[in-house]
């Protein structure tokens, strides 16, 4: 099978791990209608944060090679990620994405951590219309 990504992946038991990445804050200077985003350092500082956090879709992109390695192109066409962000990541911090699924299942557990073990996000990945409730579904029903 030809893979869409040449990302080096590591298998640890039933867990598939991506490489350590240093995401870049692509929204650092984002503004709309003269409103600064939380991703802007100045606004983040006003709110008491050290710097603007990396945006969520950047973290989601770390899961594309993992989902594609498990489910192939089907994940790219009809895959779903659902996650609860637990801690912010600032530019320059290392982040690693993980996915764990039972063989043959159409859903999996996902999470990402910083190098020091801090949880960045946790949730679910799935393909197709018959996957069990996503992380968001479960959270909304708490």
Enumerate the language-model features and the residues they cover:
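Hot-dog-fold acyl-thioester-processing enzymes
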Residues: 2-78, 132-142
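Extended, compositionally biased flexible segments
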Residues: 44-93, 100-106, 111-120
């Amino acid at each position: 099978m030809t893979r869409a990504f040449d990302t080096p992946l590591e298998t640890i038991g039933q867990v598939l791990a991506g490489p350590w990445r240093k995401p870049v804050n692509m929204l650092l200077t984002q503004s709309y209608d003269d409103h600064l985003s939380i991703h802007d350092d100045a606004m983040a500082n006003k709110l008491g944060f050290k710097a603007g956090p990396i945006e969520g879709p950047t973290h989601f992109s770390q899961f594309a090679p993992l989902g594609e390695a498990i489910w192939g192109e089907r994940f790219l066409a009809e895959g779903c990620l659902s996650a609860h962000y637990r801690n912010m990541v600032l530019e320059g911090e290392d982040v690693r994405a993980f996915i764990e699924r039972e063989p043959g299942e159409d859903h999996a557990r996902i999470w990402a951590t910083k190098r020091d073990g801090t949880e960045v996000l946790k949730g679910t990945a799935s393909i197709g219309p018959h996957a069990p409730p996503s992380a968001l579904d479960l959270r909304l029903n708490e």
